Amino acid sequence: VLNTRELTPLIGSEVVIDPKALLAGVHADEIRELLIRRGVLVMRGLDLDDGQLAAFTATIGKIRQGAMHEENGMLKVLSIPGTHFWHIDGTYTDPPPFATVLAPRVLAPGGGDTEFANTYAAFDDLPPDEQEYLSTLEVVHTMKAAMNYAVPEPTVEHFQSWQGHRGVRPLVWRHKSGRRSLVIGATASHILGMHFADSYELLQRLLLHTTQDKYVYRHRWALGDVVVWDNTGTLHRARPFDLTSGRQMHRFAVEGLEPLATLSA
């Protein structure tokens, strides 16, 4: 049985586990179940190297390949402007990654915490009639939307690089488990068939609702930490830090397990 402790009532659990048992996948099924139920799992003091981090990721599912700047599925995260705004990874692709595993290699002297918000719980707390209405809507997700604030004065080259990243997704993800979660965040450009002003207002309201303190866990990093989150049921963002600090995180992602299809698919 896993030794766990809830970090907040609605999101996040700390897991105390022997590194050898973790890498051997002894508790893999329990970890996957807990991850889906709690959204974020924190393991402290593991000091896993990149090979061990990959081995742990592989106990959760197939390691996702193909993102920019990756080495055998690993992404070295220094500073990606869009990550400072609430988002879900891979909303342009179907299926999006199931989970993400992150470990720090160099920490900034201040700032750089990572926050997570529970999109399952946020949906569950909406009135039933609003839940049903939102479940009829589709949203266009674009990299341009995600970069609007992160790159306030884009070049033509920026626009060209963003053009290929677009997807139409349901506003509410109906999971195979029967649960539903909101698909929102910085990549959400606009709601199909809705006036752009009404669309903006609704998306902003849902984001403010979902990122209330009661739905959020904020992780303050220490060397040796490993954090894994359910990318299909959470939003996340990095808090600001000194970009000259050399902060570096190593990341692996797990292939998606279920599609985020359009309503008409």
Report residues per predicted region.
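Non-heme Fe(II) oxygenase catalytic core, chiefly the N-lobe of the double-stranded beta-helix
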Residues: 2-226, 231-265
